[in-house]
UniProtKB/Swiss-Prot annotation:
GO terms for cellular component: cytoplasm. Residues 4-23 bind DNA. Residues 1-69 form the HTH merR-type domain. It is found in: Cytoplasm. The keyword Nucleotide-binding does not apply. InterPro entries: CueR, DNA-bd_dom_put_sf, MerR-type_HTH_dom, MerR_fam. It contains a N-terminal DNA binding region and a C-terminal metal binding region. This is HTH-type transcriptional regulator CueR. The lineage of its organism: Bacteria, Pseudomonadati, Pseudomonadota, Gammaproteobacteria, Vibrionales. It comes from Vibrio cholerae serotype O1 (strain ATCC 39315 / El Tor Inaba N16961). Regulates the transcription of the copA and cueO genes. It detects cytoplasmic copper stress and activates transcription in response to increasing copper concentrations.
Length: 139
């Protein structure tokens, strides 16, 4: 398979596939006599795993670790679960932070009259000045 075929099968761009090769996530494919990359089913399987890992938020380094585990016949499910648990905890922390940011923005929006006047409590909050009865919070 050439890069355009594997890109279609995996829904990845050729650029992403070359990046994953460059970063060592996939083994370099063999080259045809004309210099084109020739991919195998193992490449497809590895790239699909990488794509799924990326969709759930794994970094390239984390994808590489998951790929190593996936291709290790001696892996334990405990090791795989630990990696997934770490990612879940990271995402949970980020969600909490985003929830606080969302609440802050909701408060600021509610405090702003949104009229033609130049006074804006949102700007005052962003400048760090206290206005009205709103509290300055930093998420």
């Amino acid at each position: 398979m050439n890069i355009s075929q594997i890109a279609k099968l995996t829904s990845l761009t050729a650029k992403s596939i070359r990046l994953y090769e460059e970063k060592g996530l996939i083994i370099p494919p063999l080259r045809s006599e004309s210099g084109y990359r020739t991919y195998t089913q193992q490449h497809v399987d590895d790239l699909l795993l990488i794509a799924r890992c990326r969709r759930v938020g794994f970094s390239l380094d984390e994808c590489k670790a998951m790929l190593t585990l996936a291709n290790d016949p001696n892996r334990t499910s405990a090791a795989v679960r630990a990696r997934a648990q770490e990612k879940w905890q990271e995402i949970s922390r980020k969600l909490s932070e985003l929830t606080m940011i969302k609440q802050q923005l909701e408060e600021w929006i509610a405090s702003c009259p949104g009229d033609q006047g130049s006074d804006c409590p949102i700007i005052e909050q962003l400048k760090g000045h206290c206005c009205s009865n709103n509290k300055t919070k930093t998420p």
